[in-house]
């Protein structure tokens, strides 16, 4: 009676041993396309859109900026238009992840780290603080690639040593505003002027650079800059009122994002005290500055967008590409604002303007 039972046991153990042997020698399972597509490992600087699409997913591009105001918004619009013109359509061939720190510099660190954790193929930064945050989040991995715009000086910001000496995963276009030329318009339009009010945020490396340019340039023109520092946009109006009380005869604002984000507060004080407002961003004239001479930020966005396209297509060698300087700019005049602020604009200056706002 035991022999049949023994035979059955032997047969069962034989099948079991065969199963074990088969399992041991079977090749390791390979990830499927679907599994590979959901892997969010941060790409290196050599990642291309072709690599990402081949993995079965749309490439992700992170766009980050310090705050929303016309110049920075124009930069990002230029980038997105350049991407779209090259076939990188949001939701169709690429996923654009946009993030705005709403003027809070520490928030940029969180945004940059999230982009890295999300495995974006590329980060586009708008403003100097955004570039610094993205650089700090990517420096250990040396990627993903970064394209920067609206940066006064990547050198003073501690990102690059020279135009051809920069991190192998970081590239962009320097947007150094024509501070000296904009200041020169003040005594030209206001002969005899002596003091000009100037507000900036020292936490913005770009503003420190502009201030270091503005102070000696103003002195060379026979002007004294009355300088006030702020730390956030809510302080702009009080700072402007304090400068007006100190007897300044005009205001000048460069490309400080903290100030420009709350430009209307400065314009209010300028209008109430008949103090002409001169600016370093043409878009500021549309908001109420009397005279604005500066760079074309939409064009700068298009140009940096072209760099982003080159990276996504795997055609741009970042390490061997030099940082260029944006030189395309224009003069804008707001005649209604000038009249409100007590400034007369002669015809020869109007003739030089790319944009004249009548009312």
PLM features: residue spans?
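Short hydrophobic alpha-helices and adjacent helix-cap/hinge residues
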Residues: 2-7, 25-359
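C-terminal motif of bacterial Sec signal peptides marking the signal peptidase cleavage site
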Residues: 20-23
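Sec-dependent signal peptide recognition
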Residues: 9-17
């Amino acid at each position: 009676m035991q022999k049949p039972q023994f035979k059955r046991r032997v047969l069962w153990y034989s099948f079991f041993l065969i199963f074990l042997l088969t399992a041991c020698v079977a090749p390791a399972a390979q990830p499927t396309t679907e599994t590979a597509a959901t892997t969010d490992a941060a790409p290196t600087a050599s990642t291309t859109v072709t690599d990402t699409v081949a993995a079965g997913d749309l490439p992700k591009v992170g766009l980050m900026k310090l705050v929303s105001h016309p110049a920075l918004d124009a930069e990002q619009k230029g980038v997105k238009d350049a991407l779209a013109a090259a076939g990188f359509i949001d939701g169709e061939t690429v996923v654009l992840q946009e993030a705005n720190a709403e003027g809070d510099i520490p928030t940029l660190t969180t945004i940059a780290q999230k982009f890295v954790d999300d495995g974006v193929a590329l980060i586009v930064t708008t403003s100097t603080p955004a570039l610094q945050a993205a650089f700090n989040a990517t420096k250990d991995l040396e990627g993903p690639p970064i394209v920067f715009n609206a940066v006064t000086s990547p050198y003073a910001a501690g990102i690059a040593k020279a135009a051809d000496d920069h991190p192998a995963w970081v590239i962009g276009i320097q947007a150094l505003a024509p501070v000296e030329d904009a200041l020169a318009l003040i005594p030209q339009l206001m002969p005899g002027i002596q003091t000009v009010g100037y507000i900036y945020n020292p936490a913005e490396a770009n503003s420190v650079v502009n201030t270091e340019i503005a102070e000696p340039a103003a002195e060379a023109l026979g002007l004294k800059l009355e300088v006030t520092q702020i730390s956030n946009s809510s302080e702009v109006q009080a700072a402007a009122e304090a400068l007006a009380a100190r007897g300044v005869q005009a205001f000048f604002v460069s490309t400080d994002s903290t100030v420009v984000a709350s430009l209307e507060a400065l314009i209010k004080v300028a209008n109430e005290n008949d103090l002409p407002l001169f600016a370093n961003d043409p878009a500021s004239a549309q908001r109420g500055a009397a005279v604005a001479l500066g760079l074309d930020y939409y064009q700068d966005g298009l140009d940096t967008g072209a760099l982003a396209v080159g990276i996504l297509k795997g055609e741009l060698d970042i390490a061997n590409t030099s940082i260029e300087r944006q030189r395309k700019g224009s003069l804008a005049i707001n005649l209604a604002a000038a009249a409100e602020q007590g400034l007369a604009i002669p015809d020869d200056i109007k003739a030089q303007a790319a944009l004249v706002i009548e009312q």
